[in-house]
């Protein structure tokens, strides 16, 4: 949660981040992303419905810790301030989200074995931008945030015009089935779609368990 001394979410998270914030420095892929492995896609038959049934989301409606859960007012004001102060619309659509998880993906979520798991599918349509930020996931385990994991399963292949930036590294050419994570507490990141196809990603966030570790070891 944003503290009273900060008006900006970006300034708040940057104040404790260990990232270098040197725009001249070149970040390698392995510096900013942990590529955990690859699984064979089993969800192709569900993709059309996933995209069709996704709904537009803003910072306010993204689901703070689950579907329909709004962020604390002080957090939202600080997040929208970061957008507004650079001349953009604080109510802009940052992505589409689908909270209806098909059986093919529920099986994957079960394999991860995260406690208090939030599962959502990001469908970033052409023209949508999720502005630069650092995640604030401490709410999942305030007593020990190191136990919190955020994982991504790419549901579609990368297409030209789709951008995912971690630190100073522009990540592209992922394949459906790629699984990754990153240092969510410190790594600035953003996404955008300037292409011709939706970018579809299954995101899982929760508390890491022994089952999680065992599953990741099999990848």
Annotated model-derived regions:
Residues 172-188:
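Conserved metal-binding segment of the jelly-roll/cupin
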Residues 151-175:
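A short beta-strand-loop-beta hairpin characteristic of the jelly-roll/cupin
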Residues 1-115:
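Non-heme Fe(II)/2-oxoglutarate
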Residues 110-133:
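A short glycine-rich, His/Asp/Glu-containing loop-to-beta-strand
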Residues 149-155, 179-181, 196-213:
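A short hydrophobic beta-strand segment most commonly corresponding to one strand
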Residues 141, 189-195:
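Short proline/glycine-enriched turn/loop segments at secondary-structure junctions
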Residues 122-125, 142-160, 205:
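Short, conserved beta-strand element in jelly-roll/cupin
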Residues 115-117, 132-151, 167:
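A short beta-loop-beta micro-motif enriched in histidine and acidic residues
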């Amino acid at each position: 949660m944003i503290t009273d001394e900060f008006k900006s979410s970006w300034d708040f998270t940057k104040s404790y981040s260990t990232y270098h914030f040197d725009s001249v420095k070149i970040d390698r892929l392995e510096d900013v992303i942990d590529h955990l492995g690859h699984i064979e896609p089993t969800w192709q038959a569900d993709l059309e419905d996933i995209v069709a049934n996704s709904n537009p989301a803003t910072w306010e409606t993204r689901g703070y810790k689950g579907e329909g859960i709004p962020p604390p007012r002080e957090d939202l004001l600080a997040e929208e301030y970061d957008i507004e102060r650079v001349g953009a619309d604080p109510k802009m659509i940052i992505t589409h989200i689908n909270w209806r998880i098909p059986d093919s993906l529920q099986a994957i979520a079960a394999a991860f074995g995260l406690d208090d798991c939030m599962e959502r599918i990001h469908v970033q349509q052409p023209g949508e931008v999720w502005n630069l930020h650092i995640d604030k996931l401490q709410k999942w385990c305030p007593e020990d945030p190191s136990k919190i994991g955020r994982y991504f399963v790419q549901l579609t292949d990368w297409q030209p015009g789709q951008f995912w930036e971690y630190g100073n590294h522009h990540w592209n050419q992922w394949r459906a089935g790629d699984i990754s994570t990153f240092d969510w507490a410190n790594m600035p990141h953003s996404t955008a779609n300037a292409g011709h196809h939706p970018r579809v990603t299954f995101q899982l966030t929760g508390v890491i368990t022994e089952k999680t570790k065992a599953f990741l070891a099999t990848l």
